[in-house]
Structures are given as C-alpha cells and as structure tokens.
Curated annotation (Swiss-Prot):
NCBIfam families: argS. Its EC number is 6.1.1.19. Belongs to the class-I aminoacyl-tRNA synthetase family. GO terms for biological process: arginyl-tRNA aminoacylation. It catalyses: tRNA(Arg) + L-arginine + ATP = L-arginyl-tRNA(Arg) + AMP + diphosphate. SMART domains: Arg_tRNA_synt_N, DALR_1. CDD domains: Anticodon_Ia_Arg, ArgRS_core. Monomer. Keywords: Aminoacyl-tRNA synthetase, ATP-binding, Cytoplasm, Ligase, Nucleotide-binding, Protein biosynthesis. It comes from the Bacteria. This is Arginine--tRNA ligase. It comes from Buchnera aphidicola subsp. Schizaphis graminum (strain Sg). GO terms for cellular component: cytoplasm.
C-alpha cells in the first residue's frame, strides 16, 4: 500500500486527459498540518505554468476527473497553488485489512527480480574492527534486509583487506620475534595481532634490513609459497573468527560464505593489466603501468593517471577493484552494485568504474552506486577516539553500551532476576548503538552521545522498544483473541485516523530505503508511528470503552501498530522485547 503513489497516479492520469502531451511528474507530500489535509500536491504551480493554465482553473479540471474515486473524502484548493487532499475513513478501514492479514504488512514484491551485490563492512585482517566499521556494517545490512524483503536476489560481499605488503611485514615480524609457535597453537588473540601489526609497521619504516625481508615475504606469498600461505591463512582465520562474533552480537547477517576479499581477485590481476595494455587503455611509463583518464584532471589540468601496476610488479587497490567489478558483473551477473564505504573512496571508485567501462568489462546499464557515509564524532565535534587519541575498538564500544544499559535497567528494576537483566542489557545496549547510528542521515557526520542514545524519550531504540512492549501489554490485558475480531477498524477520532494513515505508509518507507539506502527514514517513521500511538492511547480509551465494537476496533488498531513496529525494527536488525 502506497497512498502517495495512488494519489500521484490519479492526478497524472487526470492531467493526461486535460493535456495529452502532459509529461511532468506530480509530487505528493504529507501535510504538515492535518487540518489542511492528509496529503498535498506540492508542485501544482509549476505544472500550471507549463500547461499555461491558472492554478485554480487547473485544480477544477483535476477535481472533476478524480473527486468521485473511493479514496477521497475531500479535495480543496489552497492559495496560491496547492491541492489539499483528505482521505475517506471508510477507505482507510478497508485498506487496513491488508496489513492485518498479511505477514508482509501488504508490501508487494518488486518485479523484475534483480541481482544486487552489496559491498559492506570490509574489515582489515590482523586488525580489530573499530568504530569506523560500524556504519558500513549496519547500514549495508539494513539495505540487504530491505531488498531481500522486496524479493530481490542480494549477494552480500564482505571485501576484506586480506592481501598486500602488510602480510609480508607481519610474517617477517612473527618470525623475528619467534611468535610463530604461539600463532599456530592459537595463543595469539586478535588484540595481540593488532599490537603486533603496529610494532611491525614501525620496524618496517625504520629498519631497512627488516623492510627488505618483509618485501621478500610478500613476493613469496604472492607466488603461493606454502610456508607463507599457512601463516597468512592463520592470520585471516583468527581475525574473521572475532569479526563473526561481532557480527552475531550486532545481529548482522554476514557469514563466512559472504567473504570475498582482496586475495580472491589476486590471481586475476596479471590478466587485467595485460588486457588493458592490449586494448591500449593502459601504457607503460617508467616501469609502471598507468591508465590516463581524460575524465579526471589534476590541478594543472592534465589527465590523471591511475597506476594499476607498480615498478616492482606489485598491484594496487585500483587493479583489485577493476577485477572485482569485472567478476561481479560477468560471473555474479549483477544488475546493481552498491558500495558502502566512506566519502574518501569516492574518486577512487569512480576511476575504477570508468576504466572497467572503457575496457567493456561491464555494461553501461549496470547500476553502480557509492552510498557514502559521514563520521562518528565526539561531543567536541572531532573524530570519536579514546582519551589517548587511539581509535575506539568496536567490541569495546558495544561492551560499554551493554554495561551502561544493564546499569540503567538495574536502577529502574532492582528486583529483576540476573538472567533477565543480562538479556535485557544486551538487547537494549546493542539496539541503542545501532539505532543511534541508523537514525542519522548516512551522508552526514553525527555526534555520539551516550545519554541520548540510551534515553527512553525521543527518537531512540529504547523509546521504540518500550512503545512496542506497552502495546503487547495492552493486548494481553484485553483478553480478546485477535482472530475473533472479524469487523473492520472503525475510525472516528483524529488520533485514530492519523495512526491508520501512518501504518499504511510502511510500504512507501520500504521503497525509499531500497532506492536510496537511507535507513534513517525507517527510524523516523517508527518514531512517528510510536508517537502517534502515544497520542491515540492518551485520547482514546482502548480497554475500557463502553462500546464493545469500539474496544475491538482499537485493539485491532493497536495490534497493527505493534506488528508494524516489530517488522520495521526487524528490518533494521533490531530485536523487540515483549516485557521491559
């Protein structure tokens, strides 16, 4: 059910009858003031200008063509040029039956079904995931859930950083410090590897003999040396084992089978370079292989060069990304590829896409989207870091949130048993972190605030979760089985009508996220829905209405609200709580 689309379709068809050459899109928005209508045509003045008909006269022509349709209660003109639309209560009641009986809340599948690759999370090996990985991981996962809900074939791609010079450095350091036995016996944790990586990097930058040895190990690894490959596999295994624990804690759907890291594409790189040279897209210059792109200019106005193979025959990220793109299109048959990386990767991705298209590795019809995102900031509006200036580890952030949530619940419910306290603390703590991030527009930076994200007021996970538990409690107290309520919902009060319309907006929200990858729209919707229910609860007696029909109607409307909240949170990867 998409009310805006139905209104838009009606008005556009009317405009075609008024003028057969009509080709302009009608924009429908939700009214900010309910007394002016439920919906509004936002661009009537532009349309009237193009059709050379005065706004009011155009309104009259449209009105004659659509006013008798079942959906409309009242359609009025507002100066200087707006159409305000009121929806019939009876029509709303009839349409609420669809989400009531449907497990999908009446949301239709999208056809044709498309193959969509979503590139997200992408942690580095031998390094702990930090707060910078949170946004890519959870925003990407919401997009996966939404598109799968709409019936699309989604291919998750966890493009891990598991190849390159850093592995030669790590192997050399582990050998020098006699740490390989510990590694083989699983006595080194990911935290140990993270520290080892930092120390080995310092040694690589300051010790020429060590850096030479590291480069030799890189070459051996690239040539498939068994000794180096065994160490490399162990490093990958230790890292990803910990990362999967974080994914599970975050309720993220990434699994081992979704990992397609840099190493996966490494065997393809020599052929890519040779083919680009053969097609005369790439040239050799000073021992390196470079692609010069006229589409990108440097400060001097010259075509920018993208190096795809270094003088030492080593490959770069750009080479890997070209091979990756070719594989996703030709082997995975992708119709659309979405990348969840920060804004700094934008030019790099555009260059890789341009080269792949020039080489005919991909079709011009392939949809390539970079869903970039901003940074998590501290209250002083600087990158969110520890007091000593280090990047905050994601596992530490999640544990801190669980501890804070547990303490908060314990203060509110001191008699709660330990088992329930631990379970509630984990659900609310993880939900608070996820929702706090997901509720912000991904294109912007946002300030991380413990107090706000764990608050039971405002647009937060605890507020939405509490709204859900309150409705579940009301339904239990009603003692009226929902399957026995055969009557349609009766809508008389303004708060009932507003809640009904908001429930029916669910599909519209789903489609917007599927198109733009912006989960903050769902968060805003769930907050509004919960707030509308609160107004309904305050203004309408649910359990104690004298008329049994009204009582049943309001219980049914309450159930529909809870059902919608649960589905919305589920698509955000956030768990609901039946009792809080």
């Amino acid at each position: 059910m998409n009310i805006k689309y139905l209104i838009k379709k009606d008005i556009e068809q009317a405009l075609i009858k008024i003028n057969s050459n009509y080709t302009y899109e009608v924009f429908i928005i939700s009214s900010k003031k309910i007394e002016l209508g439920h919906y509004q045509v936002d661009n009537l003045m532009k349309i009237s200008s193009r059709l050379k008909i005065k706004p009011y006269k155009l309104f009259q022509k449209i009105l004659i063509l659509i006013e008798k349709k079942k959906i409309y209660k009242k359609i009025i003109f507002s100066h200087p040029g707006f159409i305000n639309i009121f929806i019939k209560n009876e029509w709303l009641s009839e349409k609420l039956e669809i989400p009531f009986i449907s497990s999908r809340l009446g949301v239709k599948y999208i056809y044709p079904k498309k193959n969509i690759v979503i590139d997200y999370s992408s942690p580095n090996i031998a390094k702990e995931m930090h707060v910078g990985h949170l946004r890519s991981t959870i925003i990407g996962d919401v997009t996966v859930r939404i598109l799968e809900f709409l019936g699309q074939k989604v291919i998750r791609a966890n493009h891990i950083g598991d190849w390159g010079t850093q592995f030669g450095i790590l192997i050399a350091y582990l050998e020098d410090k006699k740490l390989l036995k510990k590694l083989k016996k699983n006595l080194l944790s990911l935290q140990d590897l993270d520290n080892i990586y930092c120390q080995s990097k310092k040694q690589y930058n300051s010790n020429e003999l060590f850096s030479k040895k590291s480069r030799e190990f890189v070459v051996k690894l690239q040539n498939g040396d068994q000794y180096c490959c065994a160490i490399w596999k162990k490093l990958v295994s230790i890292t990803m084992l910990e990362n999967y624990k974080i994914y599970k804690k975050l309720n993220v759907t990434l699994e081992e089978k979704h990992t397609m890291g840099e190493s996966f594409y490494n065997p393809m790189l020599p052929k890519i370079v040779e083919d680009l040279k053969k097609q005369k897209i790439a040239i050799e210059k000073n021992g390196a292989v470079i692609v010069f792109l006229d589409e990108f200019k440097n400060r001097m106005g010259d075509s920018m060069g993208v190096i795809i193979r270094k003088k030492d025959k080593g490959f770069l990220y750009s080479t890997t990304d070209i091979a990756c793109l070719k594989y996703r299109y030709q082997n995975l048959h992708a119709d659309r590829i979405i990348y969840y990386t920060d804004s700094r990767q934008y030019q790099h991705l555009l260059q890789s896409w341009t080269i792949a298209e020039k080489a005919n590795y991909i079709s011009k019809n392939l949809l390539l989207e970079h869903h970039m995102f901003g940074m998590m900031l501290s209250k002083n509006r600087r990158p969110f870091k520890t007091r000593d200036g280090n990047t905050i580890k994601l596992s530490n952030l999640l544990n801190e949130s669980i501890n804070r949530a547990t303490n908060l619940i314990q203060k509110k419910q001191p008699n709660l048993c330990k088992k329930k306290l631990i379970k509630l603390g984990e659900i609310i703590g993880i939900s608070a972190v996820k929702y706090s991030d997901l509720s912000k527009n991904r294109n912007t930076n946002y300030i991380f605030d413990w107090d706000k994200m764990l608050s039971f007021e405002g647009n937060t996970a605890p507020y939405i979760q509490y709204a859900y538990t309150r409705i579940i409690s009301i339904l239990k107290k009603s003692n009226i089985p929902l399957h026995k309520i055969k009557m349609k919902i009766i809508l008389n009060e303004e708060s009932e009508i507003n809640l009904a319309i908001k429930i029916l907006e669910f599909e519209e929200i789903i489609l917007l996220i599927a198109k733009n990858g912006t989960p903050h729209i769902m968060c805003k919707y769930l907050y509004q829905l919960s707030t509308y229910f609160s107004h309904f609860y305050e203004n309408c007696s649910i359990l104690f209405s004298e008329k049994i029909k009204i009582r049943k109607s309001r219980i049914k409307l309450s159930f529909l609200t809870a059902k919608t909240i649960k589905k919305g949170l589920n698509l955000l990867g956030i768990k609901t709580i039946k009792k809080m």
